[in-house]
């Protein structure tokens, strides 16, 4: 805050909330997506959600994986779209922001919108992502 007081502070993204900073930040992969009202009036952000795993053979870095499985890009896309609609519906309830996990696959997590080598879009049209 000393360096740039104009930037909001998320003091502990997704970890135990110490009631500090400007954002009430949660990571939510398992529970129903809801907006929590912060007693201090901080902005509520779901700073990680999603995690739908979809391995594309030939475009992974390891054999192991972690996530919530969609077997094919054909099953990945509808699950992703449903999740996006659920997030959109939370804006009117006070959701200030949301961060999908994640843009591209990483080592043991094949839950990106793009594969590890970033050559395969997992069935989502560019205008849908935008």
Regions from the PLM with identified roles:
Residues 1-23, 41, 82:
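Active-site neighborhood of glycoside hydrolase catalytic domains
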Residues 22-24, 110-111:
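Short secondary-structure transition/capping segments
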Residues 8, 29, 92-95:
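Generic structural signal for secondary-structure transition and capping sites
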Residues 35-130:
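Substrate-binding clefts and catalytic carboxylate motifs of secreted carbohydrate-active enzymes
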Residues 13, 26-40:
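Alpha-helical scaffolding within the catalytic cores
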Residues 5, 14-15, 29-30, 50-52, ...:
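Catalytic metal-binding/acid-base residues of hydrolase active sites
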Residues 9-11, 24-26, 44-47, 99:
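Hydrophobic faces of well-ordered beta-strands that scaffold small-molecule active sites
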């Amino acid at each position: 805050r000393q360096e740039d007081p104009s930037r909001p502070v998320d003091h502990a993204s997704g970890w135990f909330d110490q009631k500090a900073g400007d954002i009430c930040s949660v990571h939510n992969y398992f529970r129903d997506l809801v907006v929590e009202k912060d007693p201090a009036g901080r902005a509520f952000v779901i700073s990680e959600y999603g995690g739908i795993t979809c391995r594309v053979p030939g475009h992974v870095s390891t054999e192991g994986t972690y996530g919530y499985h969609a077997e094919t890009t054909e099953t990945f896309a509808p699950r992703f779209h449903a999740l996006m609609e659920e997030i959109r519906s939370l804006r009117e309830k006070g959701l200030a922001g949301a961060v999908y996990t994640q843009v591209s696959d990483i080592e043991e997590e094949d839950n990106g919108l793009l594969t590890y080598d970033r050559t395969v879009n997992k069935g989502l049209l560019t205008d849908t992502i935008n």
